[in-house]
Amino acid sequence: MGVKGLNQLIKEHSPSAYKEFQLKNLFGRKVAIDASMCLYQFLIAVRQSDGQQLTNEDGETTSHLSGMFYRTIKMVENNIKPVYVFDGKPPVLKGGELEKRLLRREEAQKQKTALGDEGTVEEVLKFEKRLVRVTREQNEEAKKLLQLMGIPCVDAPCEAEAQCAELARGGKVYAAASEDMDTLCYEPPFLLRHLTFSEARKMPIDQIEYKDAIAGLDMTKEQFIDLCILLGCDYCESIKGIGQATAFKLIKEHGSLDNIVEWIKNNKTKYTLPENWPYDEARQLFMNPEVTNASEINLKWKEPDVDGLIEFMVKQKGFSEDRIRSGAEKLKKGLKGGVQGRLDGFFKVVKTDDKKRKADPKESKASKKKKK
């Protein structure tokens, strides 16, 4: 679900926190990717010409494997080293959001069934995409594929995006990559969005710098988390009638969500607090997420197991052997070279005062005389 309206607020108040670039601009970087999020994207986006998901001869869905294989290779070819982080058990507070998603899928199924044979291809596809969910089996298949590709995986104890942020904060990777804006609540130095999107979509990668984002909003870490909860997150519903502009204004005026709650309770306002609203529990989940300390995680990129890839992807899943072998060669080449150093990793960029940059006219004349 993410945090509704947060993207726009940061763009409005912290434009310097945003950068847009292409995949190649991340060369030399290690990135922790929210695996569950990108598997969901692959199941929706990787389709046949008729709009149906990719399947093998046995009718098993293979869109997630195709997307994971080729997008990972594209990153490695650009000298990027990905690590995929998988969700663990969901927090108890997330149960309400998961139940809502289930109800939305059930409603989509009813609407699709109601169309019968009279619905257009576009209408049917719209409801089919709403029915998409990543199964446990698909998660395990993705892990197996990545292992054979030589790409490291991490099983998070709880939320994958929190673990991605921990790896970034701990210096194991450069950034956390996820489409969920609430990843910023876990303080990754950088959040990357659209990293696993197909290049055919021609959508640049967004980079958001956490430090610049909260500086532009002029908020503390605690106020930023309160803002995200007020906007609506996976852990608790939002307050009806409070959108992004009002949420920002209220945090500025009252300083904290506790004060806002008291203000709503003690004054005749048009806002009504949800019954038993667990905002403080949600805050604690963001402040103290259940993660494995980055220092305890050892990330290793290995040479791909070509025979294993052929057995799994070709013999079991029905992919083209030529394409899998070609992909494996690209992986070998990319991973063998290692991550090349970036210039900004060796040199510290120092801003030069414009006045100092301009040569003194007297000095210039003097130097010319010496040359003569």
UniProtKB/Swiss-Prot annotation:
Family annotation (PANTHER family): FLAP ENDONUCLEASE 1, FLAP ENDONUCLEASE FAMILY MEMBER
Task of the protein: Structure-specific nuclease with 5'-flap endonuclease and 5'-3' exonuclease activities involved in DNA replication and repair. During DNA replication, cleaves the 5'-overhanging flap structure that is generated by displacement synthesis when DNA polymerase encounters the 5'-end of a downstream Okazaki fragment. It enters the flap from the 5'-end and then tracks to cleave the flap base, leaving a nick for ligation. Also involved in the long patch base excision repair (LP-BER) pathway, by cleaving within the apurinic/apyrimidinic (AP) site-terminated flap.
Region listing for I-domain, in residue ranges: 123-254
Protein name, entry field: Flap endonuclease 1
Keyword Lipid biosynthesis assigned: no
Statement: the UniProt record of this protein carries the keyword Lipid biosynthesis: no
Subunit structure: Interacts with PCNA. Three molecules of RAD27 bind to one PCNA trimer with each molecule binding to one PCNA monomer. PCNA stimulates the nuclease activity without altering cleavage specificity.
Similarity section: Belongs to the XPG/RAD2 endonuclease family. FEN1 subfamily.
Entry binding sites for Mg(2+) 1: D34, D87, E159, E161
Ranges annotated as biased composition (Basic and acidic residues): 353-366
The gene coding this protein: RAD27
EC number: 3.1.-.-
InterPro entries registered for this protein in UniProt: 5-3_exonuclease_C_sf, Flap_endonuc, HhH2, PIN-like_dom_sf, XPG-I_dom, XPG/Rad2, XPG_CS, XPG_DNA_repair_N
Spans annotated as Disordered: 353-372
One of the record's GO molecular function terms: DNA binding
CDD domains the record matches: H3TH_FEN1-Euk, PIN_FEN1
Binding positions for DNA per the UniProt entry: R47, R71, E159, G232, D234
Region (N-domain): 1-105
SMART domains per UniProt: HhH2, XPGI, XPGN
Residues that coordinate or bind Mg(2+) 2: D180, D182, D234
Location relative to the cell: Nucleus, Nucleolus; Nucleus, Nucleoplasm; Mitochondrion
Region feature (Interaction with PCNA): 339-347
